[in-house]
A protein has these predicted regions:
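Long, hydrophobic/aromatic-enriched structural stretches that serve as scaffold segments
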Residues: 67-104
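Sequence/fold signature of self-assembling virion shell proteins
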Residues: 2-25, 30-50, 73-81, 181-279
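Extended, solvent-exposed, turn-rich assembly/linker loops in the middle of proteins
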Residues: 129-200
Length: 279
């Protein structure tokens, strides 16, 4: 007697793991690109201090010292990343896969697994490349990692970067080294608001973020940054669903994201990037 065994399909999708963006902890939105593709900001110089010539015996006509000029130059930020995607889903496929290929599911998956990781990786790459403090590459170990982090914070102190809201970025492997370091006492009693943003602790006054290695440069060791240094605008983020467009029975999904990241010249010293030797 032949018996046909039942096969069941569940409305569950084996989704890929993906991490939410932590970019907002490291960057700012201080400038508005609405109605413009390029934003220019001014950089101004200052004057040196002099000893006041109270007796008027100096060679300058002014007792205040030699009159100096002030220069004002511009810093230009032009958006360069204009990215897009398009995908079609058949009407029957959407109906017969228990919603797995529904337009809302497809767009959410694309944004979560492709768009956000790309924007993050680009932004972190710009920050590392344009950091104002980039010492020679060092092989990080559990014995030296804490000392290297202290050097980074010291560099930001010497650059007079703001002491509050600094962020220490680690990839999982360097975070493991840090946890093994006997000198480290990380403060983990932090508020729920910071935890929801991805902060896992506080170290030497820095909020500690752990970011997947695939969103960071290959030689990444760690980075200390203040959000004032990097502007990361997203000028356009458009996702459109067309129902039964010409030539397709189903849905045509289109997305476009225009974004970029810029490290400000006078604030680059608020980023310390420690690379590791290439392996």
């Amino acid at each position: 007697m032949a018996i046909e065994l039942v096969t069941k399909f569940k409305g569950y999708v084996d989704e890929q793991f993906s991490t939410e963006s932590k970019k907002s902890m490291l960057t700012n939105q201080d400038f508005d690109w609405t109605g413009a593709h390029t934003v220019k900001i001014y950089k101004a110089t200052t004057a040196e201090m002099n000893d006041y010539d109270r007796e008027g015996t100096g060679s300058n006509w002014s007792r205040y010292g030699k009159v100096q000029g002030i220069n004002a130059t511009t810093e230009e930020m032009t958006l360069t990343k204009d990215r897009s995607f398009t995908v079609a889903t058949d009407a029957l496929d959407a109906d017969e896969t228990q919603g797995v290929l529904g337009s809302a599911s497809v767009l959410a998956r694309q944004n979560r697994e492709v768009v956000i990781p790309e924007v993050d990786a680009y932004t972190y790459g710009v920050m590392c490349a344009d950091a104002g403090n980039k010492p020679a590459a060092v092989a990080l170990t559990e014995e030296n990692i804490y000392a290297e982090i202290l050097k980074g914070n010291e560099a930001l102190d010497d650059a007079e970067a703001p002491e509050t809201d600094r962020v220490l970025v680690l990839k999982p492997s360097t975070y493991t080294l840090l946890k093994k370091c006997p000198d480290v006492v990380m403060e983990t009693d932090i508020g729920n608001e910071l935890r929801l943003k991805g902060v896992i602790g506080l170290l030497d006054g820095c909020k500690v973020l752990k970011i997947p290695a695939n969103r960071l440069p290959a030689d990444f060791g760690f980075m200390i940054a203040h959000p004032c240094a990097t502007v990361a605008p997203t000028k356009l983020e458009s996702f459109v669903v067309h129902h039964n467009p010409p030539g397709i029975s189903g849905y045509l999904l289109e997305g476009r994201v225009c974004y970029d990241a810029f490290v400000l010249d006078n604030k680059a010293k608020a980023i310390y990037y420690q690379a590791q030797p290439a392996t």
